[in-house]
């Protein structure tokens, strides 16, 4: 009988010891200093003690406050201390969002000023901690309006389970499955105190959500970057998740991959990798970034292609020319020839345009033409933007302009220094350029009727006209006075020499403008085009055409509704007076003061306007250096 009672007595003794430990030992062990080995009783060290009487002595972890922002409020310190000491929350991290200086607009950074993230031991622990915290905020800080999300009380869960059992019997139903996201695994509290938000999560849920990555600084993001798990799972969503997060195999479409471009694959969470590629691309490290190629990812290939352009622009011209062949081969190898997007073709145009300007004999203008033809043949429609790019290349091409690049200069993609190479007439050069533009326009707009394609200009973007006017004029000539140069001149130019233009094609453009844009002076865009045309004619000293065009513009610039209040714009008149004065022709200046000045007053222009007065003062010095004429104007 005694033998039969011993196991029961021993089991009862073990339960008694465990209950004593739970009641008296838990708080002190978890929150007391670490015990030394000498403080353990001899009974615990007895090797003959049965296993069911042995208990593990848990060594307490020291309480450590996390690093808090320097300018954080005192209440944040108090709350974090309360979470650790009273609620038992572990691994707390605090993120300061009050000084967000990143250029990218991220909505997650505008939720609050301080984000606190902590880990609980279990779902029940988090439920208890959330309830205790709401009571603490209410009684300690008097904030009954604090909001909590994600807290599901046991009573609600029990009622939900009973309701499901009544509907479907005792068998489990799809609605009862939490799909791995159990209740109280993530609790968020808006404390309504100093813009502090608190997130309590279980360890598993915290790892899955990785909230730290949302609110950490850009420098710390690699610390929280998670690699996609590769282990197989029997989760019903594992197949879908694996499809969307697995690395995609690079397709070659029958073309062998160049040996210097090893394959690069990136997982679904790839922001750090993309940031690294952006840095490499902007710095021009095309050899380094080429290691990360993936022809299935247009974003990556665009960065690789742009790195070649940035590399070239960061070099002196002589070194850039030395690397040109190697750079060209690397660019063409990285270009996705069979599935290139419109952006890829645009980047390729910029690269080829740069190479053509550097060495026109090695890369002729035909490579730029072939790039657009290639884009069209691959199913991409040529747009007005492409037309502008093409005209810009025609204007700046050293081959078409019979010029060469000065090897002693530094290359600049926007303003490249060229020198004239021959004596070919400007008109023949201009005609050749316009022929190429007309051919390209037919490619962009195949439905245009045969004949002069410039007659259909009214259907294009108005910004194309200044480019065409540049083709028919010599704006780069050393004697040509541009509007910018005119504003910088403080005195008239002595003995200004006329700068010729392509009269035939300028007249054709003027005819198109006369039909499509008669009201020159009523619209800002058309007004600038009108000023450009006047400048071309004035630089050629064709003053009769200048005034004829001016009269036609004034006649067509009357407001449509005569009863409306119409105040004439003084800026075109001020520009015309300044243009006549700075070119410095005394005879023409006197004609203007005799005939055009009364016309200006008749059209309601205020002669006391500061711009009018400044330009007129210079004009009077040109027309009457002895200061004896035009008393009425003075």
Swiss-Prot record:
Main location: mitochondrion
Job of this protein: Probable mitochondrial mRNA stabilization factor.
Superkingdom, taxonomy of origin: Eukaryota
Transit peptide, residues from-to: 1-36
Protein name: ATPase synthesis protein 25, mitochondrial
Gene Ontology BP annotations: mitochondrial gene expression; mRNA stabilization
Keywords: Membrane, Mitochondrion, Mitochondrion inner membrane, Transit peptide
UniProt membrane topology term: Peripheral membrane protein
Family: Belongs to the ATP25 family.
Organism: Komagataella phaffii (strain GS115 / ATCC 20864) (Yeast)
Annotated TM spans: none
GO cellular component terms attached to this protein's record: mitochondrial inner membrane
Compartmental location: Mitochondrion inner membrane
